[in-house]
Amino acid sequence: MSTQDERQINTEYAVSLLEQLKLFYEQQLFTDIVLIVEGTEFPCHKMVLATCSSYFRAMFMSGLSESKQTHVHLRNVDAATLQIIITYAYTGNLAMNDSTVEQLYETACFLQVEDVLQRCREYLIKKINAENCVRLLSFADLFSCEELKQSAKRMVEHKFTAVYHQDAFMQLSHDLLIDILSSDNLNVEKEETVREAAMLWLEYNTESRSQYLSSVLSQIRIDALSEVTQRAWFQGLPPNDKSVVVQGLYKSMPKFFKPRLGMTKEEMMIFIEASSENPCSLYSSVCYSPQAEKVYKLCSPPADLHKVGTVVTPDNDIYIAGGQVPLKNTKTNHSKTSKLQTAFRTVNCFYWFDAQQNTWFPKTPMLFVRIKPSLVCCEGYIYAIGGDSVGGELNRRTVERYDTEKDEWTMVSPLPCAWQWSAAVVVHDCIYVMTLNLMYCYFPRSDSWVEMAMRQTSRSFASAAAFGDKIFYIGGLHIATNSGIRLPSGTVDGSSVTVEIYDVNKNEWKMAANIPAKRYSDPCVRAVVISNSLCVFMRETHLNERAKYVTYQYDLELDRWSLRQHISERVLWDLGRDFRCTVGKLYPSCLEESPWKPPTYLFSTDGTEEFELDGEMVALPPV
């Protein structure tokens, strides 16, 4: 037999021990210390308190009078909050919500309960939004919580135009204000916004803040202000302030050349779930700048998430929801050939894209799991509509609404019918949902659905976009009468794509000019609004051929489509046919430009190193 001791670990013992300590606490058995807060007594065990709190550990081990006392009075502590911490010490369960978390953090900071502090930090970071980010910035600064402070500051920078009028912004300390106004990452399109924010803060309490006039104004990049603004500003200043203003602005001169991050934004087409150029992954996320004709890499959704819904809000926030993820025990590798062998799980995930960090940030999940839900933003709320789901017909009818300020979902009235697929757009604060030849309108203020005029053609998997008071329903598959067979929309040889327009004021559909397409192509049409113009992004070639993409622009007065841009093969590779396409404003400096790589079809077996691309001969780069 082996002379070594055999070690066996009973994992249930720790749980049993904690439960027994909790029982002793509830029955006040073997307690050796009484905490007194606001007249309320809390009989406890020194050993338990010292285990979770550095404050109590130091108190009981100091050798001072407190270590020998049986009753200890705690000041600057709330009784209800202390009860939460004591419960955590005995059970590991921490109860907190939006109304208690800040007081809980303050008390945990005083008592030095690091586990509670970390849980509170994580909770607050997850809850940061435009309404509370300035207040949480001051809160984090007060308690020297750097992780929370940086997260709150990023949200202040991102939502600057929405937060600088808030009372919390007016209450900012001078140092925090300078830290914000000096930031290169402010999401502002005009320096006038920064100037206005600075002046509002100074004028909030002129008497006490006049001493900061020079230091605050030195953060304004005057060279970025229009001449009209500069002239009007100086003319409106009191005579005694003009010299101070000039002195303050002079200090900002070295920063004149540096634009704020928001001034560098470019409108881009965002492709989620595009076929990856990387053989080791199934999908990729990229964005294309029509102005610069460049492609940038986006961080792909976590955990190989795909079949999601996507939306870009009027405030330029990007969200994805739902979808599927591979089951870990069935996914053998990441290669494309294993895709059919992989089992998937439908999820209710919900993510916000942090454009500055180029990363997806998890938010509160939806109430239902969904595959390819239709996402829209209406009156400040995000709606997740229908989508395929494991719940069958009932789940396909469900609709839920997300409150961006509260970070929570609530159910609203369900769809009148259940569909596996639908398209949704927003016009005049109403949501229009379309599929086949049907359309329903949702009125948020009355939480009701109304059936609208039917389309002339029955099509599924079409692309829809709202432009002004019109809705465009483009492409898709025709549903043949009686047989149910799906055929590509447009002409028989695929040389055009069907377009229908809905007038929301007249409640009527009409046929519009078809979009020209190459014969026998597989266009994979996506309708988008770019630079205040209705456009379609589409493929010119069949899926079995080399991918070539173009954008067409619609002229509403002439009812005509014209070629807007031919996208070089060197820029976009084959995106497949299942990609999501939206339009949003992103920061090129925060993205990685995607270098062009010759596709595998360009390499010939005879060793040829030159080929034709975009109408010209190109030599392969050296290996």
From Swiss-Prot:
Kelch repeats lie at residues 317-380, 381-429, 431-469, 470-529, 535-581. Pfam families: BACK (PF07707), BTB (PF00651), Kelch_1 (PF01344). The modification Phosphoserine is found at S300. GO terms for biological process: gene expression; glucose metabolic process; lipid metabolic process; phosphatidylinositol 3-kinase/protein kinase B signal transduction; proteasome-mediated ubiquitin-dependent protein catabolic process; protein K48-linked ubiquitination; regulation of cellular response to insulin stimulus; response to insulin. SUPFAM superfamilies: Kelch motif, POZ domain. One of its GO terms (cellular component) is cytoplasm. Residues 31-98 form the BTB domain. The keyword Phosphoprotein applies. Substrate-specific adapter of a BCR (BTB-CUL3-RBX1) E3 ubiquitin ligase complex that acts as a regulator of the insulin signaling pathway, modulating insulin sensitivity by limiting PIK3R1/p85alpha abundance in adipocytes. Targets PIK3R1, the regulatory subunit of phosphatidylinositol 3-kinase (PI3K), for 'Lys-48'-linked polyubiquitination and proteasome-mediated degradation. Component of the BCR(KBTBD2) E3 ubiquitin ligase complex, at least composed of CUL3, KBTBD2 and RBX1. Interacts (via the BTB domain) with CUL3. Recognizes the BCR (BTB-CUL3-RBX1) E3 ubiquitin ligase complex substrate, PIK3R1, through the 4 tandem C-terminal Kelch domains. This is Kelch repeat and BTB domain-containing protein 2. It comes from Homo sapiens. The lineage of its organism: Eukaryota, Metazoa, Chordata, Craniata, Vertebrata.
